[in-house]
Amino acid sequence: MLVSKIFSNIESNIRYLRLTSPGLFMTASTALKDCRFVAFDVETTGLSAIACRVVELSGVSFRLSRADSQTFSSLVNPGQPIPFEVSRIHGIDDAMVKDAPSARQVMADFNDFIGSDSILMAHNAAFDVEFVKVEMERVGLVPPANLVLDSLTLAQVIMDGDFRPANFKLKTLAEFFGFGGDEYHRALADSIYVQKLFCELIKITGAGDLDMLVATGALKPFGQWVKQPDKESLPEHVRAHLSLLESAITSRGAVKLTYQGEFKSTRTVKPQAVIASRGSLYLSAYCTRSRAERTFRLDRIVEAVLHN
């Protein structure tokens, strides 16, 4: 019953992927044993990809047809304090990341590690994807275009009826399948749990081809896990600001910015990147007044003028 329910969605989901990412699409008959997967996880300073930063990024590259795997793991200097209540969750504090490499270096290395041919996976993928995307855009890197599998969605679709855990948290699922450990909320440990969870879920279905993953709706191109703003529907003044800011980023020029936050303020900034997050556009810029990086929501910019 479950397998037939899943596979009844194959045709529509394959059609969707062909339309939305024709260059990425793998045919439904692609054997899972021929795919390279990368399970990955991020640990952060908080929940907002705009206001917060990545403090650890890890991944496990593997194939179902082989017992060996390769790992990537690095702490990241977030350039901001890690709140105490967040450190209590993942155990990473300011002292641990003080001498860690920058986000630019770690994100570039991670891009090299995953390559363009792998299928990425994460548990609650939208969270991890958004942080990686925003961090990469913030430092001028192009986010990957790989397909991404959400192991949370996959588990929710497959583990139905009587075969259903108390909840779908990664820790609960790891213990449900008998591979739970002592360490959680560290990026490498959680990446390994995601890898093992995926293998268990594949065993349940007995699927050997990519079509099952397509059918569940748990597989999307990287960029589609994050809500993108429709630039064409932006107000005219926002589009004008966007054009000017993109020009300033290219020329590495400065901009005099009037911004409506809690209070209206005017400052000179050096634009670094325009970032999309949760359906809104943001400017990441170096503020000469505060002498630090700041983020501004584009629709709250009152005026933007090139500053000589």
PLM regions: where:
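Acidic two-metal-ion nuclease catalytic site recognized across multiple nuclease folds
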Residues: 6-29, 197-256
